[in-house]
Amino acid sequence: MLMITSFANPRVAQAFVDYMATQGIILTIQQHTQSDVWLADESQAGRVRAELARFLENPADPRYLAASWQSGQTNSGLRYQRFPFFATLRHNAGPFTWAILLICIAVFILQNLLGDQPVMIWLAWPYDPSLQFEAWRYFSHAFMHFSLMHILFNLLWWWYLGGAVEKRIGSGKLVVITVISALLSGFVQHQFSGPWFGGLSGVVYALMGYVWLRGERDPQSGIYLQRGLILFSLVWLIAGWFDVFGMAIANGAHVAGLATGLAMAFVDTLHGRKRA
């Protein structure tokens, strides 16, 4: 299935769905924070988007009202979740987003049960030449977190940004961003502080950079990050360099992650800009 658009007003969404039904195209609505309109037959996407553009120009056109009457529906056709908060958590993230989130939680529980050191011995960046062929270590450092605030902050951003990328662009793209940014941010942080570090923040900063620049250069992608949030991330980044918070922060990983995300977004939007 392909998500076509989202409407803040569920009645407007229903009007568009009703009209498309009269054109022989079946759309469905999933109600979460907004009314998401989905298309099952992706081969019809071009026609649906063309009709959507006309609909948005004048949603009050009588033909749309007539379509709603023609559908014979006296209700909105929407199904509301009994627990909308949990429905939002579930539907705003894909399987890879949830897999990483659950792995991080499981590792955090192990750290609290066994202590940080035993877990780091297995998951930390290679701290001895004999470990350099243990390939998982170049990525598994991202699963470790050292305080409740640390893991909550990272996983909230991971769910918000990673979920958006996975839902709008696909799991493959999120996997690529995660793997590349974990590797590069880990390498840079290792140069700064040695192998004893952890956290998903390098990947999170990569997602911040990717989502913001991809949204600026390619609005059609459906992902974006408000400029206020990217400004907040930059302030947090600068504050970390000057030790404003008085705690150990993986500044090298943050900078490397952000640069990685920006670079990947630039490359992904380069061809589209050239065609334009």
Swiss-Prot record:
The chain crosses the membrane at residues 94-114, 142-162, 169-189, 192-212, 229-249, 252-272. It is a multi-pass membrane protein. Its EC number is 3.4.21.105. It is an enzyme of class 3 (hydrolase). The active site is at S201 (nucleophile), H254. Keywords: Cell inner membrane, Cell membrane, Hydrolase, Membrane, Protease, Serine protease, Transmembrane, Transmembrane helix. It comes from the Bacteria. GO terms for molecular function: serine-type endopeptidase activity. Rhomboid-type serine protease that catalyzes intramembrane proteolysis. This is Rhomboid protease GlpG. It comes from Klebsiella pneumoniae subsp. pneumoniae (strain ATCC 700721 / MGH 78578).
